[in-house]
Amino acid sequence: MSPLKIHGPIRIRSMQTGITKWKEGSFEIVEKENKVSLVVHYNTGGIPRIFQLSHNIKNVVLRPSGAKQSRLMLTLQDNSFLSIDKVPSKDAEEMRLFLDAVHQNRLHAAMKPSQGSGSFGAILGSRTSQKETNRQLSYSDNQASSKRGSLETKDDIPFRKVLGNPGRGSIKTATGSGITVTRTIPSLTSASTPLRSGLLENRTEKRKRMLSSGSELNEDYPKENDSSSNNKAMTDPSRKYLTSSREKQLSLKQSEENRTSGLLPLQSSSFYGSRTGSKDYSSGSTNLDRTNVSGQTPSAKRSLGFLPQPAPLSVKKLRCNQDYTGWNKPRVPLSSHQQQQLQGFSNLGNTCYMNAILQSLFSLQSFANDLLKQGIPWKKIPLNALIRRFAHLLVKKDICNSETKKDLLKKVKNAISATAERFSGYMQNDAHEFLSQCLDQLKEDMEKLNKTWKTEPVPGEENSPDISATRVYTCPVITNLEFEVQHSIICKACGEIIPKREQFNDLSIDLPRRKKPLPPRSIQDSLDLFFRAEELEYSCEKCGGKCALVRHKFNRLPRILILHLKRYSFNVTLSLNNKIGQQVIIPRYLTLSSHCTENTKPPFTLGWSAHMAISRPLKASQMVNSCITSPSTPSKNFTFKSKSSLALCLDSDSEDELKRSVALSQRLCEMSGCEQQQDDLEKDSKPCRIEPDKSELENSGFDGMSEEELLAAVLEMSKREASPTLSHEDDDKPTSSPDTGFAEDDIQEMPENQDPVETEKPKTVTEPDPASFTEITKDCDENKENKTPEGSQGEVDWLQQYDMEREREEQELQQALAQSLQEQEAWEQKEDDDLKRATELSLQEFNNSFLDSLGSDEDSGNEDVLDMEYTEAEAEELKRNAETGNLPHSYRLISVVSHIGSTSSSGHYISDVYDIKKQAWFTYNDLEVSKIQEASVQSDRDRSGYIFFYMHKEIFDELLETEKNSQALSMEVGKTTRQAL
């Protein structure tokens, strides 16, 4: 059979995937092993979709669509809907005739019209008996498989192939099905040839009939396609009258259509008629249908008798041969999935700076992997923490709808605004400032997580005495973006070298001064300008010299190097920043070889990050060393496990530590006394008994202990006594989430004379019922606040006073809320006014300084910077490396954030990113996404490029190779699957 193929826009609707968008492609008919399938190809590529047609067509409709064009609509038995538009009418008509033939089991009569009726009858006679058996088995098994929820369009191909095996029981049904075939062959044989000619002669009339009856058929299908009711009608004799009534209604409708059209109509019951053979739609078809339904019950029962055993095997076979992209799982089609991935972020109101930075950060594959794939306990992180909002948006950005994504963007903005108020409104902001704030805040959140994450023993190492099971999570900012530069100050007089190290997340580099005779300079030149040696006034402690030379070298390289190009200069006259539109060449590769030494550390490998994702135990000696060498607030990083480790971690301020610890223990004892006081109130005993705690302190033997042992004992006692109270205080705070693991809020609210070590300890004690401590804590606090004398009032008066105070607090809270709402409205109004004024000012600046900004294109104004001087060989080598990246420590361009506009106070930010998975460049302009060539990025952003992301060449090649291997494996699996189909 020569395959039929038509081209045009395609749309598919199914229960699993929903309705796809119109996509250019083609429908192709393929016949294999007596099974007819429809293969859908898309012009954009991807794995084709295959739909079974044999015994699976429900309706075929052809409608005109323009001049000499038609739209073909195909409905399958599971209500899947396929449409192809703008098809030439002749091709569409041929396809419709073929689908009608497949629908009515006249495939070979339609495809071989040259054969006579006798020849066709012989072919049908040899094939129908097997098909009738397959139809009975397929119909019965479809009812069973529908209960397992596996009704998919493409499932019928291997399904019928297994059940159609003669060795699986077709011999048993040969007798029952043979009777039906003998009765139905004459009508089909006699009608085959004239039916073919009739279809060719009356195309227009049949199209009109199909259009008029299409809606009526669609209304009846849901009621008719009820597998449960039909199964009961066949297996339960007491329910036969339901089937007879349904068949009678269908037959009456068919007879009426025969009288009106005079042609063979589309039979809505052909799916169910398959179990009784092909029906004779003549004038006496009504009685014949009823006798067939009632007389076929025994054979149907026999076929159902052996179905339960092979049915599970057939389902298993089905899953193996199914398209690999989703076994029995609802999935998004390739076309719509690709469209979702190419969706940007909505502009919330002058938030283009945020959208551009987020798109660039999300495109860093190693950064995203370190954030999402190391098992960070997100429930231990506060809901309003930036790292949690950031990761949530990263996970959902390609799979959620636009409204959900917009809400996630607002949460990210609010998380940053909570720390940096300048981003709280809707004013225009600088993209580099937002990037710096975002990276710093992410690092702080990771530090808090590692600091407060409670220790857990590593499986199999509980008995190791020298191991403290502390989980350390990798900070994505540190492993991917942070690098270290060593500044060496060299005295010119005596040669004394003083090294100083500094960590950076990005480099802010100056524009090189461009003189007219020279060609445009590149980012490589600006980077080399940053690292060039410079002189400065410096007083040498050794010789007293006043002049020194400073050299800058990389001490540790990053995976991704972020370069911020300073495109703004301050205008003293206008007191404004002017944008410099100077042209700067954007090379594909940068090299840092001239700024590295033999001791320069390479970037963290991808394997290193993966290993850090596992729970890695640290030895106690390593923990002590980290405590001692920590440059900032070492006391907050302590994790005490034993007296020995405590003694090692003590510093010179141990006496102050001891005083603070004793004060903390006394306060905790008082809190415990308040709890005891509440218990005594319930027993009508008023005194608050804290004497036992004091006696315990006195009898603890502190006098004979050293300071170290005394501190350890006090801390241990405080931990034992205060764990329930501190646990309740954490739960009672309204700003903390139930799934929060951070204790930073508690640390900030503690008095200065308290040691924050204890609050940062993990909660190892089982927490009591919060309800049992609510009244205790409130009563205790209320007693302290109002200074209620013990025993001076009765319990009833005290509770009444407490209720009155609580009502007063509620009223004050309502007033505070109302006032805050008014202040918020006033603030929003002020922001709107500021936005209007800023817009007017930007327009004025644009009109007044347009010529000035054009003039700034000629020269950056950096008089003292001038230009880098290279030898001819060095210049040629750098030029070659810009395209090949052959020099050591080369970095590859992967993203550019550009500012479109002539002034710094107005304009728009966009982002160009390289997608490693798609191996292509895309431009993200808020919600709009478009594909772009790398050469266009380099040429179009040479005057507007603001922030540049470069990835280390070895890291880039490794990620690219991994992605290519993954895609090759997927294509191989898809090819094997298509061959099996």
Curated annotation (Swiss-Prot):
Phosphoserine carried by residues: 114, 170, 212, 630, 652, 654, 772
InterPro entries: Papain-like_cys_pep_sf, Peptidase_C19, Peptidase_C19_UCH, UIM_dom, USP37-like_PH, USP37-like_PH_sf, USP_CS, USP_dom
Subunit structure: Interacts with FZR1/CDH1. Interacts with CDT1.
Reactions catalysed: Thiol-dependent hydrolysis of ester, thioester, amide, peptide and isopeptide bonds formed by the C-terminal Gly of ubiquitin (a 76-residue protein attached to proteins as an intracellular targeting signal)
Any Pfam family the entry gives: UCH
Motif (D-box 2): 96-105
Region (Disordered): 111-308, 673-704, 719-831
PTM text: Polyubiquitinated via 'Lys-11'-linked ubiquitin by the APC(CDH1) complex during late mitosis, leading to its degradation. Able to mediate auto-deubiquitination. Phosphorylated at Ser-630 by CDK2 during G1/S phase but not during mitosis; phosphorylation at Ser-630 is required for deubiquitinase activity. Also polyubiquitinated during early G1 phase, without leading to degradation. Phosphorylated at Ser-114 by ATM following DNA damage, which in turn increases its deubiquitination activity towards BLM.
Composition bias type Basic and acidic residues, residue spans: 149-159, 245-259, 683-697, 719-734, 776-788
Biological classification of the source: Eukaryota, Metazoa, Chordata, Craniata, Vertebrata
Keyword Nucleus on entry: yes
Protein known as: Ubiquitin carboxyl-terminal hydrolase 37
Motif (D-box 3): 160-168
Domain USP intervals: 343-953
Any single GO CC term annotated in Swiss-Prot or TrEMBL for this entry: chromosome
Organism: Canis lupus familiaris (Dog)
